[in-house]
Amino acid sequence: MKNQKYIRNFSIIAHIDHGKSTLADRLIEHCGGLQAREMRTQVLDSMDIEKERGITIKAQTVRLVYKAKDGNTYYLNLMDTPGHVDFAYEVSRSLAACEGSLLVVDSTQGVEAQTLANVYQAIEHDHEIVPVLNKIDLPASEPEQVKQQIEDIIGIDASEAVLISAKSGIGIDLVLEAIVNKLHPPKESSTDILKALLVDSWYDPYLGVVILVRIIDGTLRKNMRIKMMATNSVYTVENVGFFTPKKHISDVLYAGEIGFVTASIKQVADCKVGDTITDEKKPCEQALPGFKPNLPVVFCGLYPTDSSEFEHLKDSLAKLRLNDASFEYEMESSSALGVGFRCGFLGLLHLEIIQERLSREFDLDLITTAPSVVYKIHMRYGESLEIHNPADLPDLQKIESMEEPWIKATIMVPDEFLGAVLSLCTEKRGVQLDHSYIANRAKIVYKLPLNEIVYDFYDRLKSCSKGYASFEWQIDVYEPSELVKLGILVNGEVIDALSTIVHRSRAEQRGKVLCVRLKDLIPRQQIDIAIQASIGSRIIARETIKALRKDVLSKCYGGDISRKRKLLEKQKAGKKRMRQYGNIEIPQSAFIAALKIGDE
């Protein structure tokens, strides 16, 4: 298939729950990609978590063959991209593989913050955008208002927006005609030298790593020797083909096409999303622009509740890493929790997904330490460090300054909840950058410290707006900040698993809350237990769990007072010995509950 004018490469942009995967299902069904008996909901979402949460995590592609009204047969390559902000880099690479996008907006809800972020990325990639209004068969649908919203917020003409209901199949043929008539075909190949974009990759137990590619120039054939330009590794192509969504093997992929390649690659870490693939014998001179390594943003410790499960956890993480190169981990040990792993994630959703997959697919029961971010530390003697584990923070006397990451957040919220959202952002040390109104919704842009977001910001935003606010963010800058290490001591011993790095203005409040929480959770012992929060050597909060007292005089009825005194002195000496050598056992439930702390 060398004639590029009959190829259309497109992606679908939508907020969570606006009907992206349902529309993809209908397009596959309409073009006969699957028989009716093989159809199921969310065909392209392969993981159970993707189906349950209604989100797309890995990019998927499918080739549809469509006989248009003009009598020609078109080959439509649909790229189903992740919609969540944690996977923004995957989205940008998927968009780079396409020439156009369908912007799917729920006609009962209007434009949301995440839609905005992805649309702006598509516009940066010079995409032709076709607005599609979904759920028009619902009574609450307001297509005219939503069209106006699209024009006001995004600034693209929505007068010819396609009105559909993906669930009931209304208007699907109109979407296909719009793809054929409004989206551009791929640019003509300027050279015969292979240049292909690596869009995504995943691990197959039989084939090794399967790579999703978009051919920009040249052709990709079976048995070719290919080179990855970012890692300089070389492989021999075993199979090339495409998905319909079933796997189809073909001998060659031409310029403009999207397909898959297998080449006995052992791990996904060798295939970096956004890399350029070229011919080893005749390499292209310049790699495709936009490649950057995916760096973790949020870190936390994962520990097995039962130490005998450590090897199982180690194997499970290695298996997950096969399929998810953006997830990093290294071994660490804690005096309170034993041996575990320090893991790095792209964001909070990514962290939740990995946790959920570990408990579901590998049946692991885990303790997760408080999430932290990467801080930049400038020492007095000139050295600079990057740390993400509070336990690694050097002595404050040796530190010249500390920097923390700030994000730029866009929040869309209905008018009536604006006050609550603004006060939440202010409480989280936010700085307002922009504030505008579109119909009865407000769009606010805030600069916020990432440290404040990773705790409970998203949950609190949803609860203070009754679920109506939508939120999107990207890392902005690192700025100097007055940060301190908040340590928790139980009977004078530091519990490293509960240490966190916080802003000085929040330390006292968070320390008090943690001490009160632990007081309720740690069981009483035979001696008093002191729970303290400290900054360096200064104690900023304290709670005491009173001792249980055994009544040693219960068997003494009357008689000599010296007998009673002797028993009491014996008890006193025993308690003194316990205080000296006694170890306070902190139950796992106390750790789990204390680590769920927000800023109550």
Curated annotation (Swiss-Prot):
Which residues bind GTP per the record?
17-22, 134-137
Q: What CDD domains does its record include?
A: EF4_II (cd03699), EF4_III (cd16260), LepA (cd01890), lepA_C (cd03709)
Which UniProt keywords are given for this protein, alphabetically ordered?
Cell inner membrane, Cell membrane, GTP-binding, Hydrolase, Membrane, Nucleotide-binding, Protein biosynthesis
Major subcellular site? membrane
Membrane topology field: Peripheral membrane protein
Top-level EC class, please?
Answer: hydrolase
Domain named tr-type G: residues: 5-187
Q: Name one GO biological process term.
A: positive regulation of translation
Give the UniProt subcellular location, in the record's own words: Cell inner membrane
Q: What is its EC number?
A: 3.6.5.n1
Q: Which reaction does it catalyse?
A: GTP + H2O = GDP + phosphate + H(+)
NCBIfam families in the cross-refs: lepA, small_GTP
Name the family the entry cites. Belongs to the TRAFAC class translation factor GTPase superfamily. Classic translation factor GTPase family. LepA subfamily.
Q: What is this protein called?
A: Elongation factor 4
Gene designation per UniProt: lepA
